[in-house]
Amino acid sequence: MAILDVLRFPDERLRTVAAPVETFTPELQHIVDDMFETMYAEEGIGLAATQVDIHQRIIVIDVSENREDPLVLINPEILEQAGSTGIEEGCLSVPDHRALVPRAEWVKVRALDRNGQPFELEADDLLAICIQHEMDHLIGKLFVDYLSPLKRQRIRQKLEKMAREDRKAL
């Protein structure tokens, strides 16, 4: 397994719409394993393949406190949603920034597991929010897109400055 590089906003590759997974190969299993390793190393609760420059409809999630409830969603689609909620969301691709994002409180999702087996899942609270957040990545959308243009621009400028400083330090 390997830790993958996480793309950072405003990298345009984050805007790529992910393609459906067509075949379930050993390479796909390695991608899923690497995504989990990366997510845990970055102390995240979810990661979409788009964030690691793999433009396929793959999501890994683990919202458990002890990191013992990994969930893989391949080619996910929301079948139903209800309610309204929101929490301050963060994102591995937008480090050190959080914002309140409106989300459905409950979702019913259909997806394939890592072996290509179809399943449906009903989720609420943090898991529902995380699924919606990661599914946004698959269509090239980030949580900052829910913010005003001014707030989005401020975040962009701060992250660009951080990236410049990181490059100077090398």
UniProtKB/Swiss-Prot annotation:
UniProt-listed SUPFAM superfamilies: Peptide deformylase
EC number: 3.5.1.88
Needed co-factor(s): Fe(2+)
Cofactor note as given: Binds 1 Fe(2+) ion.
Active site: E134
UniProt keyword annotations, A-Z: Hydrolase, Iron, Metal-binding, Protein biosynthesis
Residues that bind Fe cation: C91, H133, H137
One Pfam family named in its UniProt record: Pep_deformylase
A GO molecular-function descriptor: peptide deformylase activity
Top EC category: hydrolase
Gene Ontology biological process: co-translational protein modification; translation
Reactions this protein catalyses: N-terminal N-formyl-L-methionyl-[peptide] + H2O = N-terminal L-methionyl-[peptide] + formate
Keyword check for Phosphoprotein: no
HAMAP family: Pep_deformylase
Family: Belongs to the polypeptide deformylase family.
Annotated function: Removes the formyl group from the N-terminal Met of newly synthesized proteins. Requires at least a dipeptide for an efficient rate of reaction. N-terminal L-methionine is a prerequisite for activity but the enzyme has broad specificity at other positions.
The protein's name: Peptide deformylase
Organism per entry: Aeromonas salmonicida (strain A449)
